[in-house]
């Protein structure tokens, strides 16, 4: 029977080592400490076959997060499935900007539109437990995953509601609306590359220029924000100027774009006047 070290060596001829390690930890249901203190022990046939099947799927391009059913985001371990977008590190910039606009003391109302796995809403709820957080999505399958994540992290005060963008808010107003909407143009060649090939198109593609959902979110914000409330949006690295224009056109003030850790435009914010 092969050892973990031997399996890793063979797998890294086909896939990246970091991916191989993640898949082996999943197949063995162990942590890295166990793996590297027991790297030379023979493994059972079932574990070996399970790992090799995962490697085969990864070699075909299937994302590691979908193969193991989880992805780390913020301080959370988030369940994901093919019904949800895979949370990405750059989206933590969106969470940071939202948190900067939510104080610790008061019960602010927050809406996360297009929540997917619930990663953004749950990260905010974890850091601001006094906030009233509503998370919406037009996918019932995604909301099921999001609700499972809330339960797993004891964040059962987060409310989930099915509906498309502002329709799900039922005319309510919020102190902060946050969203990581689809923002890739339908003709973008990146859609045929990497993990994007396997993620739900509805969570990625937004019209001919990638701005359709962002237009809806910008235009509808004043009717759903309380005076002084913030709209916080993620977008593509080359869309900052266009999104600022959308927010200005909608009548928001204090409009600004923030960069992610790779120094790329990633998040644009605007405030509802009247505060």
UniProtKB/Swiss-Prot annotation:
Keywords: Methyltransferase, S-adenosyl-L-methionine, Transferase. Substrate binds at residues 180-183. One of its GO terms (biological process) is methylation. Coiled coil: none annotated. S-adenosyl-L-methionine binds at residues 114-118, 137, 165, 180. One of its GO terms (molecular function) is protein-(glutamine-N5) methyltransferase activity. The keyword Kinase does not apply. It is an enzyme of class 2 (transferase). Its EC number is 2.1.1.297. It catalyses: L-glutaminyl-[peptide chain release factor] + S-adenosyl-L-methionine = N(5)-methyl-L-glutaminyl-[peptide chain release factor] + S-adenosyl-L-homocysteine + H(+). HAMAP family: RF_methyltr_PrmC. NCBIfam families: hemK_fam, RF_mod_PrmC. Belongs to the protein N5-glutamine methyltransferase family. PrmC subfamily. This is Release factor glutamine methyltransferase.
